[in-house]
C-alpha cells in the first residue's frame, strides 16, 4: 500500500444493540442452588440503557473519532433506522450494510448487579445472514479490510475476496473462535497483513491450527497480542516490540 495515499477502510463484523439493565441487588441472592433444576426468576431492574454495539459498529466509531470514514460491512435488522441515524451522524458509511427485513438487529440483553455480575441473553437476529458485499468499487492498492467477529460465512468469504483482489486484510477472530475448524482458520490467516488477538485467544489459535507462533508468522506478516494491563506485543519474523499500556 503506497505511503501518503488516502486509504479506504472496510470494517466487516457485527452490528448489535446492547441493552444494559441495572439490578440494584445481587443476582445470587435470588438464585437457590438446590433448586436450579426448576429455575424461574424475574429480576426487576432500575432502568435500561440502549447502546450501539457490535464489532463492526464499535471499530468504525473509534476510527471516526480519528477522522477516518470507514465503510461498515454487516447485516442489520428491520429496526435499523436508529442505528443508521447514529452512523450517519458520526460520518460512517452505510453502503455495505445489508438490511434483513424479516429479522431484528442482533441484540444483547444484559442485566448487571451491584457486584458487577452479569446475566446476558443474546439474539443473533440479522447476524445469522451473510452480508454478501463484493468490493466491486474497491481500489485494492489503496484499501484495507478489517475482518472482525461476525457472520462466519462472511469472515471466510471476505478473506478470499481480499486475496483474489490483492487487498490487504486484518484478521481479528476474537469471540468467533469457537465456531472455527483448524484447517479453515489456517486458510483464513494465510496471506493476511495482521492477526490481532489477546494472549488467551492466541494460545487457542495455536492449539486449533496446530502451529506455534513462528508457524503463524509464516501465514500472517505481523501478530499483535493485547496483554491487558501489560500493554501489547507486536511480533513479526524479525523482532518483538512491547507497547506499554
Feature-to-residue mapping (PLM):
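Hydrophobic anchor at the start of a short beta-strand
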Residues: 9, 68-71, 94, 169, ...
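Conserved phosphate-binding/catalytic loop of the ribokinase/pfkB sugar-kinase fold
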Residues: 95-100, 108-149, 153
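A glycine-rich beta-to-alpha transition motif near the start of alpha/beta enzyme domains, typified by
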Residues: 69-96
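A short, aliphatic-rich alpha-helical micro-motif
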Residues: 138-140, 189, 217
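Conserved beta-alpha-beta core of the PfkB/ribokinase-like small-molecule kinase fold
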Residues: 144-213, 230-232
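Conserved phosphate-binding/catalytic region of the ribokinase-like
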Residues: 9, 210-245
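Cofactor-binding loop segments of dinucleotide-utilizing enzymes, especially the Rossmann-like FAD-
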Residues: 14, 74-78, 99, 114, ...
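Glycine-rich phosphate/adenosyl-contacting loop at the front of the ribokinase-like
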Residues: 2-71, 82, 244
